[in-house]
Structure formats: C-alpha cells, structure tokens
Amino acid sequence: MLIEECPIIGVNVRVWLFWSYLRRPRLSRFLVGCIPVAVLNVFQFLKLYSSWGDMSELIINGYFTVLYFNLVLRTSFLVINRRKFETFFEGVAAEYALLEKNDDIRPVLERYTRRGRMLSISNLWLGAFISACFVTYPLFVPGRGLPYGVTIPGVDVLATPTYQVVFVLQVYLTFPACCMYIPFTSFYATCTLFALVQIAALKQRLGRLGRHSGTMASTGHSAGTLFAELKECLKYHKQIIQYVHDLNSLVTHLCLLEFLSFGMMLCALLFLLSISNQLAQMIMIGSYIFMILSQMFAFYWHANEVLEQSLGIGDAIYNGAWPDFEEPIRKRLILIIARAQRPMVIKVGNVYPMTLEMFQKLLNVSYSYFTLLRRVYN
C-alpha cells in the first residue's frame, strides 16, 4: 500500500506530496509555495522590529509573525527529515494493511479512520475559513492596511500600485501557508489515532489468551501454543512502544516551540481583546484565539488519549484468565503489566508529557500573565 493510499493518513500525505515536501522535491513547487512564504516571514520580522507605539498593531503583527515562523519551521523540519517521515508513513501503511485483514479489529480501525479523515478535512476547511478572515479583515477597517504587516526596505508598501500588488501576493500566499501549517497538526492527530488502534488490537490479542487457555484441553493444543501467542503479544507491545517513540521524535521539538510561542501570544491576544472597542477587531481576535486553542488542544488531547489507553494494557491482562495459566506464562504477563505501568507518552521538548493537565497549566499561566498585564495597563 502506498502511503498516499493509506486511508487514515492519506489526506495529509497528499497535501504534502502536492507541494513536493515528501519524496523527490521539485523546485518549481517550492518557488510558488514555501520559499515566498519564508520571504514574507522575513519582511514580517522587519515590520515587527520597526513597530512602536501602537499596542494593538504590535500584538497583531507579532501573532502573524510567530504563526508564519512556526509554519516555516514545520515545513523546513519536514523537508529536511522527509526520508524519516516517509519511513514512518510506510510503516503506518504496512501495519494498516495488516490490521485491515483482522476481522476482530476492523470495526475499530474503520471508526478511527473515519474520525481521522473527518478531522483532517475539517481542519483544512477551518484553516481556509480562518485564512479568508485574515485576508478580508483589512477591507473593513479605515485606511489602508495589509493582511500581514510587512516592511520592505526602500519600498513604501502603502503607496499605489505597490499596495495593491503586495495585497494580492499576500492573499495568494495565504493558501500555501495554510497547507504548510494545518496538515502537520492533522498528521499528528491521525497518527495518534492509529496508535490507539494498535493498542486496541493488542488488548484484543491479550484477551484471546484466556480463550486459548479455556480451549487447550478440548482442542489438544499444548502450552506451547499459548506461549507462542504470548511472545507475539510481547513483540507487538514493543512495536507499539517504538511507534509512539518514533512519532514523539517527529513532533516533540516543534511542540516545545508552540508551547512557548503560542502561550505568550494567547496572553497577548487576551489582553488585546480586553482593551479593544471595535467589533470587527474583537471578532478577528476571537478567531485568532480560537485557532490557537483548537490547534493546541488537538495536540494535547490526542497525546492524553494515548497515555490513558496504554495504561489500560495492564488492566486488560489483569482482567483476563491469567490465574489459569502456567507459571512461566504468568511471569511473562507480569512483565507486560510492569511495562504498562510506564505509559507511552509524547513529550514537549522530550521533557514534559503532553496531557490535558499540561494543557490546563498552559491556559492557567497564560491567563495569569494576562491578568498581570491588564492590572499594569490599568
């Protein structure tokens, strides 16, 4: 199965293949996609460096600068490590094909596949809608304004016809920028969903051990059959652990960047929302905050699900028919239970586990700094 044909990851992989971020890079796609977006981000930093006085303008420019810097880093990391991503996706496609043949796990696989595809497609539509808000907002404010504040040395970007040209270019670049940012979040979410499928498959295999024990006498199976099945469960458990480790290595450092940057931007946007008195600006700030929270929540919620379900592996064994097994098999089951007490975790910068508790702490810190800013401002 080709990676773009794998249903659970196919939506995001096709977007990346279209822009040549996977497999063989094509310079023509880079010249109309990620390279102009990276140049735009440089001009955004120049604008941010030269912005003084207007607090709302500074915060909005800072938000877009950080957002575009984040998506440029995401794409750069993807392109530089594309072989690593391709190998990971090939493993997902191969395992998906095997699980699809398993009648017991197929309903779970199909349910999570539908959920993953719906999440990927809805994220793209949400990104398109928010991006449309980005580029149309300047049309509803007095005076000339660009979707993204930029400074081009030696050029007055608000003078005719430069203003019109830059505006149209920014509208165009919003599309490839959206394709650089959204699929990475969806890739992470769908891959964690696939980890949940594998954990469910392991629990089913462990549950079948009890049925083996109960039918050994009637079918003439020896303890060797049960032992061989247990060895396969051990190997599969180790495979899932390696899968989560590989996924963590692909996202952990970018999650740290988002944790630091968007935590600060959330605080700044809340502050700007509290002092804004224009309805259009308040609506736009609300959409910015919603985008930050939705993307961050997608990361932390799915990572938390993997952690909780991996802890349930030990419960699946303990609730089985392990007292009926022979002592050598019981000892190996204890090893699996002991390993399951160390949950499979995806970490922020390989330091802190990504859990809903961690997400709540991020919100608490952002809100605390917001109240401090508000008090100082008043």
Curated annotation (Swiss-Prot):
It is found in: Cell membrane. It comes from the Eukaryota. Residues 1, 51-59, 142-164, 276-278 are cytoplasmic. Keywords: Cell membrane, Glycoprotein, Membrane, Olfaction, Receptor, Sensory transduction, Transducer, Transmembrane, Transmembrane helix. GO terms for biological process: detection of chemical stimulus involved in sensory perception of smell; olfactory behavior; sensory perception of smell; signal transduction. One of its GO terms (molecular function) is olfactory receptor activity. It is a multi-pass membrane protein. Its main location: membrane. Belongs to the insect chemoreceptor superfamily. Heteromeric odorant receptor channel (TC 1.A.69) family. Or30a subfamily. Odorant receptor which plays a critical role in the anthropophilic host-seeking behavior; establishes the host preference to transmit malaria. This is Odorant receptor Or2. It comes from Anopheles gambiae (African malaria mosquito). The lineage of its organism: Eukaryota, Metazoa, Ecdysozoa, Arthropoda, Hexapoda. The gene is OR2.
